[in-house]
Amino acid sequence: MNWTADFPILAADENGNRLVYLDSAATTQHPMQVLNAVVDYYTKENANPHRGVYELAMRATDAHEGARHTVAQFFNAEDDEIVFTQNTTESLNLVAYSYGMNFLHEGDEIVISVAEHHSNMVPWQRVAKATGAKLVYMYPGENGRLTTEELDKKITPKTKVVAVAMVSNVLGLRAPVEEIVKRAHAVGAVVVLDCAQSAPHTPVDVKKLDVDFAACSAHKLYAPMGVGALYARAGLLEKMPPFMSGGDMIGAVHESGATWADGPRKFEAGTRNVGGEVGFAAAIDYMKGIGWETMETHEHALLDRMLAGMRAMPWLTVYGEPVAEGRYGVVSFNVNDVHPHDVATILDAGGVAVRAGHHCAQPLMEFLGIGSCCRASVAIYNTPEDVDALLENLENVRKVMGL
């Protein structure tokens, strides 16, 4: 099937060419089903949730809590285990500051991968500096994947937190989450899972994975920017202090102090982005209508086609094992001896949109021995013709650069 027609922006031309959007790892486009849901909310239900007793405000509250229920089902979690945030970055910071700053101490160890996005690295660097805990890095093997030997070496009885991306935003490879959780829980550590790049492409069942925290962004799931979700195991949420203070997160306030609201509302200070939350829920419904098996099969075929074409280009380097198996959404590469920005600019002239840069993963770039790279990322709306357009325009890069 072809879902491109659901996404109006993809009907646009770029530089006189059909738009080939291959930057969905940065943000996805929106189907009309999501856009219509957001418009319906703002034209029929817009009010401040949890504030008013009038009918419109009650409908806004229902929309807000209904979206929470949909997100909870998406993660196979309970409603009171889902905190709405702005994005994955805020979700991970919430865990670092509310859990890490309060429950880690000198001599404890925080284990992360060198491949982490800065949002799952810098907060833990700050926690380590503030608490005296030690930050321990895991390094991938030659194929870009974490090995069980590395897990056994780095996860020890001193480990209190293991924070990893389920899928790398650069390499696109799935981490051995099940093996990580088994080892972390065996020593009493909690597992924090960055699902920004996995949630759009493969199920994140928090009960099956048995993780303690999981974070994602709506805008990488065909929904609006400005909304994210944090799953937190209920027992952990109860003992964590609030990350921010203000309206709607309190139980009561007196001159002498304050008490906090129960459940996730303790972490939801201020007016929420309900329109975005409604869009988030609509996007999940859209994905559910397609089905995981259909989505994974479609995207796997696109990656397989892309990597097969790139393997036939000896003047191009792919990062991470250049196979589609165990890879989700992302292929990062460089045209040898050509700056990634030049590659992306030439591709853009042909209507092909990819990202070039360090992808908020500078330590991984250093580990790979490069300063930056290009990244092509696929979504449900991409087609085999999109992949062919990328490959054809990469051939044009070779010709233009005289390779």
Question: For each of these PLM feature ranges, what is it?
Answer:
Residues 1-403:
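Pyridoxal 5′-phosphate
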